[in-house]
Amino acid sequence: RQIRYLLDSEVQSSDDATKILKLPLSNVIHTLYVKVECTTGSTSAQDLDIDDVVDKIEVIGNGSEVLFSLTPPEARLYGLLDFGQPIAEKVDETANAVMFAVYPILFGRTEWDPNFWLPCSKFTDLELRIKYSPTIAATAWATGTVTITVIALMTMGGDPGQYMGTLRKTTIYDFTTVASGDEVIDLPRRLLYRRGLIYCYESGTEDGTDITKVKLSLNNDERIPFNLEWADLADLNQLLYDIKAERAMKIYRADTDVVYTITAEGQGLGLLNETMFGGEAQI
């Protein structure tokens, strides 16, 4: 086993670009950790975090084979499922503060899965692509401060165990709507499924309001593995994965401002500095 820097705190020369990192073409990659940092503007960065800096993270093999392709909120939620706790991050909305987030990319069931991993030698080209485009402003992000670090968990000089496959995570469907009704999604059938994630967000709307029920149907209802209310499905996920949906945030707000933690259920709230938060902030 070896933990390797593939990129170490590289400051990006552009404020809007795609960082392409060539990955090793030998040995085995179990997990990649992508750390992105950015400095807030000279005034503040209210309602912003690193998810607003990064647009998409991808791992592409041989130019077109998609092994990983998620937006930061999706990668964040998968990390919550994989580890049962939030990803490593720093949220600090005050002026000239360095925020960061670490997005995990697992090619197996766990960080060091001996059976599911990425066999680098099977590819002639292997790229990690990080698309970023922070808004440059005094009330957003400072120019020239996007910094990227990539760490790989690898097995060197041989296979860690019997190879059974590579787990990939990709977005297969996304949409925006103001209408109510049923949304039918045809799932691709080329590969086996291990797990699916349904993510829905509307600013100012309580979890479980927009999506009320989820059904998985096989062969036109020949088999129905589940047909559950959204709230019940969320409760089952909590039991299965022991999810701790918590975020630590240093926020810059007036007394009556609203703070969106973007977690399904608030697990607790601590006011670290009442002179900053005020006594009547709405959470």
Predicted regions mapped to residue ranges:
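Beta-strand-centric surfaces of beta-sandwich/beta-rich domains
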Residues: 1-283
